Each structure stands twice: as structure tokens, then as C-alpha cells.
Amino acid sequence: MNFNEILYGVAYYDEYMPYDRIETDFKMIRDAGMNVIRIAESTWSTWEPEEGVFDFTHLHRMLDCAAKYELKVIVGTPTYAIPSWLAKKYPDILAVTHNGKELYGHRQNMDITNPDYLHHAQIIIEKLMEQVKDYDCVIGFQLDNETKPYDTCSKYAQAKFVEYLKNEFPDIDEFNREFGLDYWSNRVNDWDDFPDVRGTINQSLAAEFCKFQRSLVTKFLSWQADIVCEYKRDDQFITQNFDFDWTTHSIGYQSQ
């Protein structure tokens, strides 16, 4: 892949905007000297309004208009904000964290280790890729959005954590010794008795769980990349916009 210009652009969401704005907006984007837009990552419920029913009208409007105004496009996989029907049918998809069970309504409230979530995420990614793969204006793909482990502490995540520890410490006595778990009777004598890690007072074990949670993000994004790679062209890239503490760097928040 070769770019002979700096990519400079903006995120655009036709599904949020007054529908008659798209021609005006894309002309303004081009005339402002921008050359790329990012689309699609925030509206799973628009692309799949009910289970198994897909509507990519807004997607094709944006891609066709981008081609008309010679704008490049980065397409995001729409997996960081789940539709309401998914949360209702599979309530276990809503993450369990140190603060308890998530409620539906905000983004990034799902458990990225949940099998039902992963099953439906794969379906929407594949459907999206089928829609965009033949557009020349699509130059790359963003996996998910601002991905983090979201403090996932579900039964699925904790079971994976126990397997991770068993691989790291085949001898359970060594595990207890390394983490100092004899203190306050925290010793684990059988892996099947491993307690809910959210209750631990052992900061070494808590830190190990945080480390493990971050590894879940790597696996999640690698899993998405494998799906996207089945569809993308050789001249298209894959990227991700990792989140960071951006609020303190936003206008109006900087220290004077």
C-alpha cells in the first residue's frame, strides 16, 4: 500500500445527520482540503435493526457519495456498541465488572469474551465486509473502536483467567507461594475452588488479573483482524484507534 499524500479527514455518520446533507457535507469536506472519512463503527443497530435483518442503505449512500467527491474511506467494524435486541435476547452479553452488572444504554458495555457476543459480532463484521469489499474508495478498516477490556469480570473471563494461571503455574503450591496467598487464608488448594477474583485483597493477584484482562483485548482484535483479512484487498490496511486519557488533552481542559 502506497499513499503519496497525508491522510486528513473526519468521521462521518449519515445515519445521524439530516439525510439531505450528505452532498453538501461531502463537498465541504473535500473543499476544506480533507481527503478521507471514517464511517460505520458506531451503528450496529442501524446495520442490523433486528436479528438476521440487515439494512446497509446509509452505508452505500456514504460510499457512493465518497466516490463521487473523490474521498477515501476507512470502514470501522461496528462492535463497540451493541443493539438493544442483542442485549435483550442475551443479557449475559452485558459485562460484569468490579462495579456489578452493566446496564444497556451506553457504549462499551459488553463482555468481549462472551460466546454469544462473539458469534453475532462475527456475523455483522462479515456482512459489512461483503458490502464494502468492491468499493475502490475503501482504503482500510478500523477494528472496533477505542477498545479496552472494559473491566470484564464475567464467568467467561474468570474461567479463562484460571486457565491462564494454570498454564503459568502448573504447580498450585508454587502459585500460592508466588502470590503469598497463605495470608488471611486466601490459599487456593484446588483450581476448581478458585474464588471470584473481584473480591481479592491480594494486590499481586489483582494486578495479574488486570494484565490478563489487557491480553483479552489483544486476542479480541486479532480475532477481528483474521475475519477482516478474509475479505480485504492487498492494498487495504487494518488499523485500530486505541483509547487513552484524552479528556485532559481536549480543548478547555488543559492546565493554563
Q: Positions of the model-derived regions?
A:
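Polysaccharide-binding and catalytic clefts of secreted carbohydrate-active enzymes
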Residues: L103-S255
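Glycine-rich anion/phosphate-binding loops
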Residues: M17-I22, G52-H58, P115-I123
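Boundary/entry segment of secreted carbohydrate-active catalytic domains
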Residues: M1-R21
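Aromatic-lined substrate-binding rim segments of carbohydrate-active enzymes
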Residues: E23-A32, V36-E102, M129, Q224-K232
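A generic structural signal for short coil/turn motifs at secondary-structure boundaries
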Residues: M17, T46-E50, T113, Y150-T152
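Short, well-ordered coil/turn segments that N-cap beta-strands
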Residues: F3-Y8, G33-N35, A67-V73, D134-I139, ...
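Short, solvent-exposed turn/loop segments enriched in Gly/Ser/Thr/Pro and often Arg
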Residues: Y13-E15, A40-T43, G76-W85, I139-K148, ...
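Conserved strand-to-helix beginnings and helix N-cap segments that scaffold or border functional pockets
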Residues: Y19-E23, F56, S154-K155, I251-Y253
